[in-house]
Amino acid sequence: MKQQRTRNIIFLFILFSVNGLLAQDLILKLVSKEQNELLVLKKIDYVKKHIKRSSLYSEVDKISDYLKNIGYFTNTVIKIEKAGTIYTAHFSLNAKVETALIELDSNSKIYVDEFQSKNNTVTIPLKKLQNTLYKISKNLDKEGKSFSKVQLKKIKIKNDTLYAVLKINQSKKRVIDKVIIKGYENFPRSYIKNYFDLSDSTTFNQLKIEEIAEASEGIRFISVIKPPETLFTRDSTFLYLYFKKKQSHRFDGIASFTTKEDGKILFNGNIDLKLNNLLNKGEEFELFWNRIENERQELKLTSKTPYIFDSKLSPEISFSIYKQDSIFTNTTFNSIIAYSINSKSHFAISYNAESSENLTKNNLENIETFSNFFFGLQFKYNRPKNDYFDHDKFFIEINPSVGKRKVDQEQSKQFKIEATASYLWDLNFRNSIYVRNKTFYLNSNSYLNNELSRIGGANSIRGFNEQSIFSKKFSYLNLEYRFLTSEKSYLYTITDIANISTPGGNENLLGIGLGYLFTTKNAQINLSSALGRSSSKGFDFDQTKLSVNWISFF
């Protein structure tokens, strides 16, 4: 029995030893008889360890090709010696070619214009030859001649010079004759022409296909099933796009709870209903309602129709009513006509008018009945991150405008500018930093409280009551550190810093807190808690703001 056990132990020892030997890496070494050639080989960055012989021999071929690209066209592998797990490749590099003398024909002259030609011949440093041939192929592809062939023929090597004839067999120029949508046949056709910038004469090339693939990810009301595909026939080119209509309507509800000075609970709430692409035209409609007890109330309607009359013009109209206690009521009309520059940016002209009614019949709080109007410009650029949360990687919007305000019979000129910018910086797969800045400035010879911009709350400076801060000039920074807990959720910190100009003077504000955002099948829920302080008032934990933001998709 003891003898049998000993045999088993010996057998297992041998088995593991053999497996260990079989699992050992194969080591590749490069050598040459010539010292100067050995120095060249030592500078090559190559894969030294391999599991399979086939991988090792493939690496030797790659090294030989690399040597040809840097001028050693006649390099040879004399032999590969094996000693255990070490494989030694013996190279002979031979003479190095420094220059290529390329003869051109009539078809190839325009593609090598960066080099001066003489007698239909150009001299190209050997180290630039491969890149030059690659550029020629890329330029032909941009012209729609994707099936062209670029070749060096009649290659001869004499001393340190390579002689060859450049032959370019240009293929027929191809255009995208037809775009076919699969999976969402009712996809708005206006997007094909104006969003993707495609027409019957659009040149087919790889760059355009990549642009379309990237732009597709930025459309909020579709899911991309798979990348674009192309079908080539003898005379036509068909582009296939694979989309699926997704649930993009959203109902957004926010409930906020805080404590008033008398100790009672203050309830803040709003409804934000957005209908996107309801008619398969890419249109947007929004209904926003907000009420904070009896203190203030707002109703806003917005409508946007993209690419009207199959053009690059997209009008947007909004109407809102805001009531502050029983002090004043503001009615605002905004209109924008945007011109699409490309899928990421647009330029627009705007007109907005506002009228305000003083409900107190006195001017104790610097409130007057007035009306104003502004004409302005707008530039907007956004680059989607294409993540699960529909975040933007980079966003910027600038809106300068000029106008007039009328109080009784007195008119005064005004100027205002509003700018918003944000950036999402990925540190690694799980960690990211989000930065957002919004700046507003109103210039006037006098200011009324009921014409000032209103900020504060979950969508601006967290830790303060919704729209509780009236300001003629402000700039605030939202800073978040985000930690991805899963593909569909993340924790984040809140650090909001602001400098504001109010009727009471200039103040610095700070809001800090924590939040957690997660998604379910048809909803996105954002929970946060924030605490604010100002220059004149410190932190008060009894004034902590709890925010619950629930977005339902349907």
Where are these regions (language model features)?
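C-terminal outer-membrane beta-barrel translocator/porin domains of Gram-negative envelope proteins
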Residues: T258-E261, G376-S486, T493-I497
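Short glycine-rich, acidic/polar surface loops and turns
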Residues: N478-E480, L509-L517
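Feature marks short, surface-exposed loop/turn motifs that line or immediately flank catalytic pockets
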Residues: S355-E357, K404, Y441-N443, N499-S501, ...
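Outer-membrane beta-barrel proteins
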Residues: Y72, Y322-F328, G403-K413, S536-F539
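Bacterial Sec-dependent N-terminal signal peptides
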Residues: M1-K29, F554
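Periplasmic polypeptide-binding modules associated with outer-membrane biogenesis and secretion
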Residues: Q24-E34, I44-T259, N270-D272, E286-E293, ...
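C-terminal hydrophobic structural anchor segments
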Residues: T485, Y490-G513
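Gram-negative/organellar outer-membrane beta-barrel architecture
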Residues: N205-K208, I212-P227, L231-E397, W425, ...
